[in-house]
Protein backbone atom coordinates (compact mmCIF):
# COMPACT_ATOMS: atom_id res chain seq x y z
CA UNK A 1 0.00 0.00 0.00
CA UNK A 2 1.38 3.39 -0.97
CA UNK A 3 1.85 5.93 1.81
CA UNK A 4 0.86 9.54 1.42
CA UNK A 5 3.74 12.02 1.39
CA UNK A 6 2.31 14.33 4.05
CA UNK A 7 1.13 11.61 6.40
CA UNK A 8 3.03 11.83 9.69
CA UNK A 9 1.23 9.15 11.68
CA UNK A 10 -2.04 8.62 13.47
CA UNK A 11 -3.34 11.79 15.08
CA UNK A 12 -0.50 13.91 13.72
CA UNK A 13 -1.11 17.03 11.70
CA UNK A 14 1.33 18.65 9.37
CA UNK A 15 1.99 22.36 9.88
CA UNK A 16 0.12 22.32 13.17
CA UNK A 17 2.32 25.06 14.59
CA UNK A 18 3.30 26.95 11.47
CA UNK A 19 3.79 30.19 13.41
CA UNK A 20 5.78 28.91 16.36
CA UNK A 21 7.12 32.38 17.12
CA UNK A 22 3.74 34.14 17.22
CA UNK A 23 4.59 36.07 20.37
CA UNK A 24 7.75 37.44 18.76
CA UNK A 25 5.63 38.93 15.97
CA UNK A 26 3.64 40.93 18.52
CA UNK A 27 5.16 44.23 19.62
CA UNK A 28 5.56 44.01 23.40
CA UNK A 29 5.59 47.17 25.47
CA UNK A 30 8.98 47.19 27.18
CA UNK A 31 8.50 50.04 29.65
CA UNK A 32 5.99 50.66 32.44
CA UNK A 33 2.49 51.39 31.15
CA UNK A 34 2.16 54.58 33.19
CA UNK A 35 5.18 55.94 31.30
CA UNK A 36 4.27 54.45 27.91
CA UNK A 37 0.78 55.97 28.10
CA UNK A 38 1.76 59.20 29.90
CA UNK A 39 -0.03 61.29 27.26
CA UNK A 40 -3.66 60.37 27.93
CA UNK A 41 -4.87 62.16 24.79
CA UNK A 42 -3.11 59.54 22.64
CA UNK A 43 -4.86 56.88 24.67
CA UNK A 44 -8.45 58.00 25.17
CA UNK A 45 -9.46 60.36 22.35
CA UNK A 46 -11.42 58.93 19.40
CA UNK A 47 -8.32 58.77 17.21
CA UNK A 48 -6.27 57.23 20.01
CA UNK A 49 -5.05 53.78 20.95
CA UNK A 50 -8.23 52.61 22.76
CA UNK A 51 -10.41 53.42 19.74
CA UNK A 52 -8.05 51.63 17.34
CA UNK A 53 -7.94 48.56 19.57
CA UNK A 54 -11.75 48.54 19.74
CA UNK A 55 -11.84 48.57 15.94
CA UNK A 56 -9.51 45.58 15.84
CA UNK A 57 -11.86 43.64 18.14
CA UNK A 58 -14.49 43.39 15.39
CA UNK A 59 -16.42 40.14 15.69
CA UNK A 60 -15.69 39.70 19.40
CA UNK A 61 -18.63 39.80 21.78
CA UNK A 62 -18.76 42.35 24.57
CA UNK A 63 -19.20 39.40 26.93
CA UNK A 64 -15.73 38.06 26.06
CA UNK A 65 -14.17 41.47 26.70
CA UNK A 66 -16.05 41.96 29.96
CA UNK A 67 -14.78 38.61 31.27
CA UNK A 68 -11.28 40.03 31.08
CA UNK A 69 -12.33 43.41 32.46
CA UNK A 70 -13.92 41.70 35.47
CA UNK A 71 -10.59 40.04 36.29
CA UNK A 72 -8.79 43.37 35.92
CA UNK A 73 -11.34 45.03 38.24
CA UNK A 74 -10.76 42.26 40.80
CA UNK A 75 -7.05 43.05 40.67
CA UNK A 76 -7.76 46.76 41.20
CA UNK A 77 -10.04 45.90 44.11
CA UNK A 78 -7.37 43.65 45.62
CA UNK A 79 -4.81 46.46 45.37
CA UNK A 80 -7.14 48.55 47.55
CA UNK A 81 -6.72 46.12 50.43
CA UNK A 82 -4.09 47.01 53.02
CA UNK A 83 -2.75 43.45 53.04
CA UNK A 84 -2.43 43.24 49.25
CA UNK A 85 0.85 41.94 47.87
CA UNK A 86 1.61 43.62 44.55
CA UNK A 87 3.35 40.51 43.16
CA UNK A 88 0.30 38.36 43.91
CA UNK A 89 -1.98 40.84 42.16
CA UNK A 90 0.42 41.11 39.21
CA UNK A 91 0.51 37.32 38.88
CA UNK A 92 -3.27 37.23 39.00
CA UNK A 93 -3.30 39.72 36.12
CA UNK A 94 -0.75 37.64 34.19
CA UNK A 95 -3.12 34.64 34.46
CA UNK A 96 -5.19 36.39 31.80
CA UNK A 97 -2.57 35.37 29.23
CA UNK A 98 -3.10 31.59 29.37
CA UNK A 99 -6.86 32.11 29.73
CA UNK A 100 -6.96 34.21 26.57
CA UNK A 101 -4.61 31.80 24.76
CA UNK A 102 -7.03 28.97 25.52
CA UNK A 103 -10.01 31.01 24.32
CA UNK A 104 -8.08 32.04 21.20
CA UNK A 105 -7.36 28.39 20.47
CA UNK A 106 -11.05 27.59 20.67
CA UNK A 107 -12.21 30.56 18.61
CA UNK A 108 -9.77 32.23 16.18
CA UNK A 109 -11.60 35.59 16.48
CA UNK A 110 -10.44 35.76 20.11
CA UNK A 111 -6.75 35.64 19.17
CA UNK A 112 -6.87 39.44 18.90
CA UNK A 113 -7.51 39.62 22.65
CA UNK A 114 -4.55 37.35 23.33
CA UNK A 115 -2.31 39.48 21.11
CA UNK A 116 -3.47 42.63 22.91
CA UNK A 117 -2.71 41.08 26.30
CA UNK A 118 0.72 39.82 25.21
CA UNK A 119 1.52 43.34 24.02
CA UNK A 120 0.47 44.98 27.29
CA UNK A 121 1.15 42.46 30.08
CA UNK A 122 4.75 41.51 30.84
CA UNK A 123 7.39 42.00 33.53
CA UNK A 124 8.55 45.29 32.00
CA UNK A 125 5.13 46.86 31.46
CA UNK A 126 3.59 46.04 34.86
CA UNK A 127 6.01 47.27 37.52
CA UNK A 128 3.79 49.09 40.01
CA UNK A 129 0.17 49.65 41.02
CA UNK A 130 -0.08 52.63 38.69
CA UNK A 131 0.60 50.36 35.69
CA UNK A 132 -2.33 48.12 36.62
CA UNK A 133 -4.52 51.20 36.98
CA UNK A 134 -3.47 52.43 33.52
CA UNK A 135 -4.22 48.99 32.05
CA UNK A 136 -7.66 49.12 33.70
CA UNK A 137 -8.33 52.57 32.23
CA UNK A 138 -7.18 51.42 28.79
CA UNK A 139 -9.25 48.24 28.74
CA UNK A 140 -12.33 50.01 30.11
CA UNK A 141 -11.99 52.57 27.30
CA UNK A 142 -11.57 49.82 24.70
CA UNK A 143 -14.83 48.21 25.83
CA UNK A 144 -16.61 51.58 25.81
CA UNK A 145 -15.52 52.27 22.22
CA UNK A 146 -16.27 48.68 21.21
CA UNK A 147 -19.82 49.11 22.50
CA UNK A 148 -20.14 52.52 20.83
CA UNK A 149 -19.06 50.98 17.53
CA UNK A 150 -21.81 48.39 17.82
CA UNK A 151 -20.13 45.57 19.69
CA UNK A 152 -19.65 42.27 17.89
CA UNK A 153 -21.76 42.88 14.82
CA UNK A 154 -21.30 46.49 13.79
CA UNK A 155 -17.75 47.51 14.74
CA UNK A 156 -16.41 49.62 11.92
CA UNK A 157 -19.75 50.89 10.58
CA UNK A 158 -19.65 54.08 12.67
CA UNK A 159 -16.56 55.42 10.95
Placement of each model-derived feature along the sequence:
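Small/polar/charged residue-enriched interaction surfaces, especially the RNA/DNA-contacting tracks
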Residues: 1-159
